[in-house]
Amino acid sequence: MINVTLSPSVTVGNEAPFTLFGGINVLESRDLALRAAEEYVRVTQKLGIPYVFKGSFDKANRSSIHSYRGPGLEEGMKILQAVKDTFGVPVITDVHEPWQAAPVAEVADVVQLPAFLARQTDLVEALAKTGRAVNIKKPQFMSPAQIQNVVEKFVEAGNEQLILCDRGTCLGYDNLVVDMLGFGVMKKVSGNRPVIFDVTHSLQQRESGAAASGGRRAQVAELARAGMAVGLAGLFLEAHPNPAEAKCDGPSALPLAQLEPFLAQVKAIDDLVKSFAPLQID
């Protein structure tokens, strides 16, 4: 078992109690980030869930040139630092270009490799050299077994603080499904490194030719329960006070007001599954 320790209170591992990587999709404003973080911290502390705040400073892969991308690197780091200073929690954000890695790592406790960029060697090496823990998003077009090649790149570049994340797999055009058997494959080929599940991005669904993703928010609880029943290191989640007004991926976002009952169910599943004795079936 390989664990990744992010703080004295947050250790990410497949056999450890699950860690929540939760926040908002894109950093819309300082006030919204702090409002969301406050609710996440309240609920996770009440339920005893290790917690990392998530927010993107730039959504560089938006489908439309007219879509909101975020506040940018400088302002985004100020917002993430404000969350850290106010609530004392680790933070995670995604990096899209090699030159961004070093300044992001000055603030972020976890740097994220976006799914669409997971095979970009220059970016992998730049993230590895930060010395920070890295969350590797498995591309929608990549089989679970192929994640081994991405892991090998990071290890060769000198960084073994790796977390692997599944965010769904393409099923034909404009649709994603979650392969529940894939989680175990990712654990196996990586030497049992922590594997987490991005439930909200897995709910994306797009109408052909649409400029923005739709989503299946109503099914977020059932998909999260199913994923956590496998036995995972963590859950990756995005919520919003008013998903209809979110500037990115609102149709997949959990309403922030439902965070506590949602996480109570997820934690109950995680606690139950990890109370079982290991069962080896050859």
UniProtKB/Swiss-Prot annotation:
| Subcellular location(s) of the protein | Cytoplasm
This protein's gene is called kdsA
InterPro entries linked: Aldolase_TIM, DAHP1/KDSA, KDO8P_synthase
Q: What's this protein's family per the entry? A: Belongs to the KdsA family.
Q: Where's it mainly located?
A: cytoplasm
Annotated GO MF terms: 3-deoxy-8-phosphooctulonate synthase activity
The GO annotation for biological process reads: keto-3-deoxy-D-manno-octulosonic acid biosynthetic process
One GO cellular-component annotation of the UniProt record comes to: cytoplasm
Respond yes or no to whether keyword Transferase is given for this record: yes
EC annotation?
2.5.1.55
What is the official name of this protein in its record? 2-dehydro-3-deoxyphosphooctonate aldolase
PANTHER family according to UniProt:
PHOSPHO-2-DEHYDRO-3-DEOXYHEPTONATE ALDOLASE (PTHR21057)
Which SUPFAM superfamilies did the record assign?
A: Aldolase (SSF51569)
Keyword annotations of the record: Cytoplasm, Lipopolysaccharide biosynthesis, Transferase
Pathway in which this enzyme or protein is active? Carbohydrate biosynthesis; 3-deoxy-D-manno-octulosonate biosynthesis; 3-deoxy-D-manno-octulosonate from D-ribulose 5-phosphate: step 2/3; Bacterial outer membrane biogenesis; lipopolysaccharide biosynthesis
* Catalytic activity annotation: D-arabinose 5-phosphate + phosphoenolpyruvate + H2O = 3-deoxy-alpha-D-manno-2-octulosonate-8-phosphate + phosphate
